[in-house]
């Protein structure tokens, strides 16, 4: 399988990671300057927590969705599709899971390519045709191929610390908690958290574009994924609101985020639907000319 490269997209992702790295470097310097060893101990503990979260991301995500791993004799067709697409993507076959939910969606999780899980909802299986389902599964396998769980965990780590400092930093300032430098550090942390939040969301959107492109490379059929995205989007209108609320915390994982009127474009984990469809159609035209 040949992965087609969108150098503009790669450049935007690299630039976003560069900005995050520079921001975090300055942030760590500020923390070391303003806080004593107590804060550094907390940073080490939070680093350990992030490692636990990283290594057990698949179990946490499946539990959050109420999903269960399924054997080939339980979901033979789903297993066959994922096995064939994994071979086309040059990936080990991931663990297969199903969540009993009316919300038509899917996600991939796991710390690396050898420890990945692809989960689909029963609502997704009922909603899509075989070709459309393969497009969605290929999108999730592209996330695995691109190591997106690892990338986003690394990108989010110091943002989480910045949020912690904003909430609880004054507790670790000792006798200096009322001094101006401590409050300057908290304000700096607030700025770092807001800016990094927006950069991480931008990175997430870029990686969705990359997964769409990867899915097209795996299947050779961008129109199937485009059709699946439109069908899922329409189906969301008929899903009970309580089901959507129950799964809103999984937005960043899903192929299509659960809608929320309070989330603006800058804070969204996914690109606008029309933009994704447009890029898939452009990719289809590009493939037809090759």
Question: Which stretches of residues belong to each language-model region?
Answer:
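Hydrophobic or amphipathic, alpha-helical segments that drive membrane association/targeting
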Residues: 1-107, 155-209, 233-237, 285-290
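Cytosolic juxtamembrane N-terminal segments of multi-pass membrane proteins
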Residues: 1-7, 118, 137-141
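Active-site recognition of the HExxH zinc-binding catalytic motif
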Residues: 58, 82, 120, 135-143, ...
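Active-site scaffold of zinc-dependent metalloenzymes
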Residues: 67, 106-130, 261
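Short pre-active-site segment immediately N-terminal to the catalytic Zn-binding motif
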Residues: 70, 122-135, 199, 205
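Alpha-helix N-cap and coil->helix boundary residues
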Residues: 77, 132, 153, 206, ...
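Active-site-proximal gating segments in proteases and membrane effectors
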Residues: 91-115, 216-290
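Catalytic Zn2+-binding segment of zinc metalloproteases
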Residues: 141-157, 222-223
